[in-house]
A protein has these predicted regions:
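Acidic (E/D-rich), amphipathic helical modules within compact regulatory domains
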Residues: 17-69
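Structural detector for short beta-strands of small beta-barrel domains
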Residues: 1-14, 74-96, 125-128
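Beta-strand/loop nucleic-acid-binding surfaces
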Residues: 24-46, 104-122, 128-134
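A structural signal for the main folded, soluble domain(s) of proteins
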Residues: 48, 66-69, 78, 113, ...
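Glycine- and charge-enriched low-complexity intrinsically disordered segments
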Residues: 81-119
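OB-fold/S1-family single-stranded nucleic acid-binding modules
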Residues: 56-84, 130-138
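Single-stranded nucleic-acid-binding OB-fold domains
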Residues: 11-13, 47, 60-69, 92-93, ...
Length: 138
């Protein structure tokens, strides 16, 4: 997946990016830039407004979840924050802490990683609260 950076907030190695997907929908993602530490609101020299970044989405740091019947949805209620609330459909179980899910964010299945053990089944519709992460592919 390719994302175009619309806005970028930096803090140390952390990057919070308002991005435009190829279908022109907008999302906010978090990723780490280990090759560039930035403090005091300096500008990144590696990633900046207009840059295209390539990678994979995942929902991480899920601290709350439960089975919820309903349509696929997501919202990111906080400005410049990767915080996400979503209803997703379980497609593959990885282990007690992770699964792949169908979302309405994109066509690809997204890895969802939980902070505690969960027991969901294939095709369960679940509500999750976490962080929308972007794993950059070099």
């Amino acid at each position: 997946m390719n994302l175009k950076i619309i806005n970028i907030c930096t803090f140390g190695y952390d990057r919070f990016v308002d991005a435009e997907m190829e279908d022109k929908n907008k999302i906010i993602v978090h990723f780490m830039e280990y090759d560039e530490y930035i403090d005091n609101d300096k500008k990144s020299e590696r990633k900046f407004v207009g840059s295209i970044i390539k990678g994979k989405l995942r929902i991480d740091l899920v601290t709350g979840s439960y089975i919820k019947n309903g349509e696929l949805m997501f919202e990111q209620p906080h400005r410049h924050s990767s915080h996400i609330i979503a209803t997703v459909e379980v497609k593959r179980i990885v282990d007690e802490f992770s699964l792949y899910a169908k979302t309405n964010i994109c066509d690809d299945e997204i890895l969802v990683e939980f902070e505690s053990k969960v027991k969901y089944g294939i095709n369960d519709s679940i509500y999750v609260v976490g962080s929308l992460e972007f794993d950059i592919i070099s």
